[in-house]
């Protein structure tokens, strides 16, 4: 099965090597969805979203929830987005173990910044919408889309200090943790304890397996799929399963890099002293050479931790398939259904939460905390730089759309209308935040390349 997965992912990895801009692909999918939703093909578009997804073994349908087959929309949001959150979980674990969240001193400022970027947007949203059912969307402007935010920062090139990229990345990671907690606490349904208990047992087995150096990726793929199925049946949102599974994946390789280097020296010497049979038309290796090369391949594979190997394999799938597909099925705002009087309701609340709430929350919490003895401003960052980065934090998009789908029930007419309004707020808030953040940073950053870290 691991080979099958590699065969599926190999073309995507080759595509990713060319380094196409994943954010542009995401943006293109969004535009296509919006055009289709407001065109003569709108009915076809919505029929596609309702298309049933089946995967059956005998009488058991893997993609059924409470006896109902998943639609394309549900499959993307509940199944494929679990893979996205799995990769997010791997990145969070890496940051906690060895990255910007690995020590209290390094983590404090982005944690405080992220807290401001979650609390203040919710307050601004509730200033505009504070009655049911509109208030259900209060968590929508909490999210920061790290891919889009870093893409906008990347437009400024080498003028951006490395410390600024690190700060924004760490802030977004903490933001993701907050979003995951919110989804787990407030967007899960009635909990069925039997499948939940079984899923926790499977998670424990995955964790113990990792501790006992079971590094077979198939072990985590199969175990993870079982946990996802059980979470689906338990009533807890299945994307949470992706994060929890990620935390069980080992971050230590079987072979340390120093040992790999020593062993490689011996293997290369063995190859040097073995003749190659070759002609103009062919080159034939000896059994010894084949064995040595296979040993090198195995050794190299064991020198990369399962956490990094799995993340590396799944990143192309997430960036070039799952996220564009998510945007395509969720970004279809029907403008004709939006009445002028509703613009001051959910759309305004989400817009203000993202553009004003995120900016003020991140900037004020960060700046005030940096004035205390417990933290300082990152090297190369000024107040003006921080203000520009805070604006980029208002680019919500992916996770904001995801929370919007959880906040409002699109299967009812009233819920679909509110969801449509929320999507409009996400698009406008994210776009204005990105544009203003870019313009501010373009103005305040040094004109020459910076060397600070």
UniProtKB/Swiss-Prot annotation:
Top-level lineage group: Bacteria
Residue ranges crossing the lipid bilayer per the database entry: 22-42, 72-92, 108-128, 137-157, 166-186, 189-209, 218-238, 316-336, 343-363, 386-406, 424-444
Swiss-Prot/TrEMBL catalytic activity: Na(+)(in) + 2 H(+)(out) = Na(+)(out) + 2 H(+)(in)
GO BP annotation list: regulation of pH
Gene Ontology molecular functions: sodium:proton antiporter activity
Family in the record: Belongs to the NhaA Na(+)/H(+) (TC 2.A.33) antiporter family.
Protein name: Na(+)/H(+) antiporter NhaA
Source organism of the structure: Parabacteroides distasonis (strain ATCC 8503 / DSM 20701 / CIP 104284 / JCM 5825 / NCTC 11152)
Gene (name only): nhaA
């Amino acid at each position: 099965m691991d080979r099958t997965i590699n065969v599926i992912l190999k073309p995507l990895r080759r595509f990713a090597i060319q380094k196409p801009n994943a954010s542009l692909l995401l943006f293109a999918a969004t535009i296509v969805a919006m055009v289709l939703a407001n065109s003569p093909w709108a009915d076809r578009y919505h029929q596609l979203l309702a298309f049933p997804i089946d995967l059956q073994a005998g009488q058991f349908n893997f993609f059924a929830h409470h006896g109902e087959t998943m639609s394309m929309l549900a499959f993307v949001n509940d199944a494929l987005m679990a893979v996205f959150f799995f990769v997010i979980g791997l990145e969070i674990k890496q940051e906690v173990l060895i990255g910007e969240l690995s020590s209290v001193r390094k983590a404090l400022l982005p944690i405080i910044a992220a807290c401001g970027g979650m609390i203040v947007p919710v307050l601004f949203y509730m200033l505009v919408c504070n009655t049911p059912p509109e208030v259900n969307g209060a968590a929508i402007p909490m999210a920061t889309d790290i891919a889009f935010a870093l893409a906008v920062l990347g437009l400024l090139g080498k003028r951006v200090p490395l410390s600024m990229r690190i700060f924004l990345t760490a802030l977004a990671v903490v933001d993701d943790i907050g979003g995951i907690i919110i989804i787990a606490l407030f967007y899960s349904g009635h909990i069925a304890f039997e499948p939940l208990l079984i899923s926790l047992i499977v998670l424990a087995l995955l964790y113990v397996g990792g501790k006992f150096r079971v590094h077979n990726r198939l072990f985590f793929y199969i175990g993870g799929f079982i946990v996802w199925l059980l979470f689906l049946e338990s009533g807890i949102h299945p994307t949470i399963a992706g994060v929890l599974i990620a935390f069980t994946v080992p971050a230590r390789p079987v072979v340390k890099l120093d040992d790999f280097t020593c062993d490689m020296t011996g293997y290369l010497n063995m190859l040097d002293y073995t003749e190659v049979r070759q002609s103009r038309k062919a080159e034939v290796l000896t059994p010894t050479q084949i064995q040595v090369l296979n040993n090198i391949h195995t050794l190299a594979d064991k020198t990369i931790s399962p956490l990094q190997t799995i993340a590396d394999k799944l990143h192309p799938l997430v960036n070039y398939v799952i996220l564009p597909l998510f945007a395509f099925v969720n970004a279809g705002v029907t403008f004709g259904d939006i009445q002028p009087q509703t613009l001051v309701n959910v759309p305004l609340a989400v817009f203000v939460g993202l553009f004003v709430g995120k900016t003020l929350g991140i900037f004020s919490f960060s700046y005030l905390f940096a004035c205390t003895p417990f933290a300082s401003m990152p090297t190369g960052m000024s107040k003006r730089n921080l203000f520009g980065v805070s604006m980029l934090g208002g680019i919500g998009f992916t996770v904001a759309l995801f929370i919007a789908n959880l906040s409002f029930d699109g299967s009812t007419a009233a819920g679909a209308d509110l969801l449509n309004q929320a999507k409009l707020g996400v698009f406008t808030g994210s776009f204005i935040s990105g544009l203003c953040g870019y313009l501010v940073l373009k103005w305040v950053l040094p004109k020459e390349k910076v060397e600070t870290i």
